[in-house]
Amino acid sequence: METAPDEAPTEFLEPGEEIVENVIEEEVVHEEDVEHHEEDGEMIEVQHEEVLEEIVEEDGMMFDTDGRVIEYSDVMVYEEGTEVIEEYVEVEDLGDGRYAYVMTDDIGHRRLLKPHEVEAVKKMPGMMEEEVVMDDEKAPNTSYAAAQKRGRFPPQARSSLSPQKPRAAGAYMGPEAYYQQPKRMTHMAKVDVEKYSPVTPVNRRPLMDNAIFKSKLPRKSAPWQEETAANGGPQSTSLIRSPSPMLKEPLFDDNEIRFKCAECGDGFPVMDRLCDHMIKQHDCQTNVREVQFFADRDFENFLLKVEKATLGRDPEDAIRKKSRAGSSQLFVCNYMNKGRQKMAELVEVGIVGLSERPLEVCTAFVQKTHGYECIRVKYCDQHIHYDGNIGFRVPIAVKRRLFEMSFKRLPIPCMQIMLGLEAEQLLPHPTRFEEKLKNLSHVEIIELLQIINASLRKHQEVEPRGKKVPIKFETIKSSEGSQTLMVKRVTPPKKEHMDYDEPDPNIPSTSAQALGYNPDDDEGDDVPMMSREEEVLDDETGEESVMTEDCDGMMEDNMLYDPENNRDPLFDELTEVELGVLDAYEHDIEIALTEAQKKERTRLKAKFALNKVIGIYQTLDTATHGLTAGELHTDTINHLRDMASYVVELVCQIDAEVKVRRNPALRIDDVKRDMIAGIAMQERVHQPERRPRRSAAPASPAKPQYRPQPPARSHEEYTQRIMNKVKEYMPRRRPDAYDLQQGQQQSRLQMLREQTLLRAPLEEEKPPVATMAPVPDEHKAIPWTRPGRKRAMGPGEAATAPAKRRGRPTKKEEAAEAAAKLIQAENEMVVEEEEVEEPPVVEQEQVPKEKEVEVAEAEKLPEQVKTEPSVTPSSAPPTPATTATKTRTGRVVKPKKWDDN
């Protein structure tokens, strides 16, 4: 029976259940399905399973399926045409009583709150308070089996105005309430910030589902479906609260590889980490910078400058990038997105479009974020693709090396060769750019040098005084028939004063003058802008840089290799490899040098050769300090030979210079090469120390080709004969000075050893200490022998009788003759007698005379006589018939002649 609302309900307890005071609640919550999603229980999400499906709106109020009014307590409704940006304040504990207040919006942008904003957030009610859950009743069980019984009169909630009593010391606490932790300062609070921009439509991207809040499985039947609405009470209201603030997640998973490095293949979830990787691993200048603007027009101008500076071209006004007011934008380089034949440009992409981009991307991007007081822009202006300007992708180490070589005034072909030789040292990680660096063209090197010099002029406080000169590339054929590049200075034409004379009717008018305009009409007072030629002044000196038609490029005058115009390389700064490459290049182009220039090159070559000799000598001195010649290592001797070759080269260089001074028609390199070749030929042909000299002594009589020798008796004798024959046919050479010195050293050591042995006192030789006790004979291992077949002994036979011969028995006469021959042959051989134990005494009746003779002779023979291959084995004489054996039954059994076990 159901009770009235103001009466206490009757509940029947299960056996073993404690009696808990039932508190009547005033607030109607019997439709809500309460779930505690987080461990600390601070977040409560209310789910209307089927009520939300059928919501009827009438007269400005909303009703659910049971006709109850749905009230929205804390959900704010905004006017149509407004954009709402939700921001979350997250408090992070930094330790030592310090906290960081970070505000994050829907798009994922984070910023630190200012001090006055932090104070404002702290003053907001219910934001930063620590909430301790005081629950006096047992934690509710939300399972369907243990759900409370519902009736027509729903239970009423406790009044919120009544003060809560503190928990008693011994009060019961349920398991869920026990593990509930209070709300901390590090948790997140939600702040709604309205930005009214009626021009922009609402275009908010819904947040993705949070994995922490998992929806419960639907029950079999909702509790309100079991109720009857016949005797319905007063109109109840269902309270819908806004969903709890979710943990702010990044828009993309951190483990997802979205941006892939084009060089090594490493993947990163965000572009900032890819730019940082390109700086650290591939030496690229992909620095991420931040700027701030206060107007969208300023941002558009900045975007235009970035695109012009990085891509080298002016975009048209029709396709100029527009800044959308009050929204965030992202511009990326679309080089990886479109065909390689198209030009790269910065294009705007959305959040969804960015997630669908290909993995290999360019690092150039511009990201705009609207803040409270300004527009924040984060950008990277460094491209990593090869097309267009080569300076986009060249690492800083390569640019430094190029500037160093240009500072030394090395020719462009020498720079190409040096970059190819040093590509592996300049690029610590193997990349695709390595092959590009080994095959850089001269045009790309000129372009790179212009980029480097422009960057230096931009960042230097003192402006350089050098000027640019036009250059032209020419290809000549060297003496060896190969094509060699030459960079020549182009003489600029002289400036002529421009007089506005009468134009020649045969020459068509150009775009520099307006059509139908005669400057004599106005006497030159008002010359229109189209007819005036603007002077393009150089950034450095203010002089006009002339770019003629036959010119292939511009280059700094101080960095141009031109020995004919007093622009020689800086020889004191050149390395040995650079000098060798320069010497080969000058030999190919056959450049005319003065005597001073030739002396300078010769001096530098002699300097490097002398430095090599000194270095090798110091190495030899360190290695051979305190050592004799016999203790030198093979590598040390090889170094000694290298040092000798350097000395020979240096002497030939000096000798060639002396000869060229006497005869200017000769070339130093040719004379030096011929001298070195002659020395090498003489060393190969004339070697008196290494080759045996033929003496005038009479020739010895020729030895016979074959001298019969008895066969060797042992393996050692055979080896000795072979070695003697090898020594006999070995060529005898004259002992070198090194061998004589080695022999004297050995004889001296032998003499010192003998003197030491004579003077040293004699000591008794002690027997070697036994490291292990001797093993007794009975414990020693017995060698394994193959077991042989044994003959069954008869009752009257002796144990020492010889084994019977297997096979077909022979006649008695033949056996006796064979035994007599065997005994006669054994008596003729001289055998050393040994002590033999006496055989056991056997009765005369059992052993016949022939058996006695055979046993005695067999014991005297040694083992080697038995195994002599010259003696042919013969069948043993047959044994005499033994006495028959009687069994218990009287049966006579004769022994068998042969028995095989």
Swiss-Prot record:
UniProt zinc finger (C2H2-type) residues: 259-282
Compositionally skewed regions (Basic and acidic residues) per UniProt: 846-866
Low complexity compositional bias, start-end: 817-828
Observed effect of gene inactivation: Enhances the cell death defect of ced-3(n2427) mutants. Double knockout with the synthetic multivulva (synMuv) class B proteins lin-9, lin-15B, lin-35 or lin-54 results in 100% lethality during the L1 stage of larval development. Double knockout with the synMuv class B protein lin-53 results in slow larval growth.
Lineage: superkingdom: Eukaryota
One record GO biological process: nematode larval development
Acidic residues composition-biased segments: 829-840
A GO term, aspect molecular function: zinc ion binding
Keyword entries, A-Z: Apoptosis, Metal-binding, Zinc, Zinc-finger
Region annotation Disordered: where it falls in the sequence: 147-169, 218-245, 494-528, 682-717, 779-901
InterPro entries: RegFact_GeneExpr_CellDeath, Znf_C2H2_type
Role this protein plays: Promotes programmed cell death. Its role in programmed cell death may be in conjunction with cell cycle regulatory factor efl-1 and the synthetic multivulva class B proteins dpl-1 and lin-35, and is independent of the ced-1, ced-8 and ced-9 pathways.
Protein name: Modifier of cell death
Gene name as annotated: mcd-1
